[in-house]
């Protein structure tokens, strides 16, 4: 992990949500604003360990979008977002998962 990324995690705010300590970090929450340098660092780290022999990068709605964007720009691979809401678009795939 880069020193800059480590410092950003060590210095992020932590809030209690019920009995859970939840850390607030720009890359996970977009709060405070996302530093482009952190996106650069994280996307480089992912490119070093992941195989991106793919046609499309897939990310979860909201939290994954900044990192998917950075990877897409660097790799020249389009990305798509898995969303909670259904739009009834042509070719849209509906997947349901129930937990708890």
Task: Describe these PLM feature segments.
Residues 1-53:
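Active-site-facing substrate-recognition patch
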Residues 40, 61-62:
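Short alpha-helix boundary/capping motifs
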Residues 44, 65-66:
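Residue-level marker for well-ordered alpha-helical positions
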Residues 51-54, 75-77:
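Short glycine/proline-enriched coil/turn segments at helix->beta-strand junctions
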Residues 53-61:
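Short glycine-rich phosphate-binding loop at a beta-alpha junction
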Residues 63-64, 85:
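Short glycine-rich anion-binding loops that position phosphate/pyrophosphate groups of nucleotides
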Residues 66-76:
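Short Gly/Thr/Asp-enriched flexible loops that form oxyanion-binding sites at enzyme active sites
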Residues 76-100:
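Short, glycine/charge-rich flexible loops or terminal/linker lids adjacent to PRPP-binding catalytic cores
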């Amino acid at each position: 992990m880069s020193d800059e990324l480590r410092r950003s995690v060590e210095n992020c705010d932590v809030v209690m949500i019920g009995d859970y300590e939840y850390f607030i970090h720009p890359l996970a929450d977009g709060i405070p604003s996302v530093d482009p340098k952190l996106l650069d660092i994280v996307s480089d780290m992912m490119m070093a360990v992941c195989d991106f022999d793919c046609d499309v990068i897939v990310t979860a709605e909201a939290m994954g979008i900044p990192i998917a964007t950075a990877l897409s720009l660097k790799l020249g691979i389009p990305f798509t977002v898995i969303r909670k809401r259904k739009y009834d678009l042509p070719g849209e795939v509906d997947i349901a998962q129930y937990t708890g």
